[in-house]
Amino acid sequence: MESLRELYKIGVGPSSSHTMGPQRAAKRILELFPDALRFHVDLHGSLALTGKGHLTDYIIEKTFSPIPVTFSFKSDALSYHPNGMIVHIFDQKDQEIKAIEVYSIGGGSILFKGDMEEKPKEVYKQKNMDQILKYVEEQGISLYDYVLENEDDSFVEFLYKILDAMFQSVESGLKKEGTIQGKLKLKRVAKSMFQQAQNTRREADRERLFISSYAYAVAEENADGGQI
């Protein structure tokens, strides 16, 4: 089984497959080609058909900045997955030096094809929950101990970063007003809901409003392309 790092990821909304995945792919490519003159990205399948609404081109352009990037939107899907794209890299002579095929396969996970293809490392010997529960019972350990037994030494620090990102998205969403970007112009309500909770006397109603305001805060941050 893969590391829990593959489950918990920090990225931008509104979609793990249409923004978080493409952002991770762009970051990886930029690390390999920091001196590129420009990039051109062919968005295929679902990334092309719904990419504008999901801010796919926006997050790729933001990630590659200040290096310029242009886009082609192609409705045909690539062979492996509906969320595919091809990134063309151009050197300082404006000659294409590489074309990288990459897929955003869900949950922020990405898959490169060809010589950049990598598979997540297996860090757990057990393959399913039944095997895990049997193992922890035999060893007399908790699930938390089981995780620490298998993950690397920096995993607890990683979890604190994830927790901090969760709190930050709530706090950020509670501070903002106005409308969410996009044609629907949906009004943000988390801040007003939080203020309503503060002024509610009945404890059960107050707690329900607080919880709802936190949920709306994260949802609105996600929809508006914020970090979650």
Task: Walk through the language-model features, giving the residues of each.
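N-terminal glycine-rich anion-binding loops that anchor highly charged ligand groups
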Residues: 1-3, 33-37
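Conserved phosphate/anionic-ligand binding catalytic regions in large, soluble enzymes, centered on
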Residues: 8-26, 222-228
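Generic structural signal for well-ordered, non-membrane alpha-helical segments
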Residues: 19-22, 26, 53-57, 80, ...
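Buried hydrophobic packing segments
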Residues: 22-29, 60, 64, 215-218, ...
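Beta-strand segments within the central parallel beta-sheet cores of soluble alpha/beta enzyme folds
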Residues: 36-45
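Mobile "lid/hinge" segments at catalytic clefts and subdomain interfaces of large enzymes
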Residues: 44, 55-145
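N-terminal amphipathic, basic-rich helices that act as targeting or association modules
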Residues: 131-166
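Accessory "access/gating" subregions that flank catalytic or transport cores
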Residues: 157-228
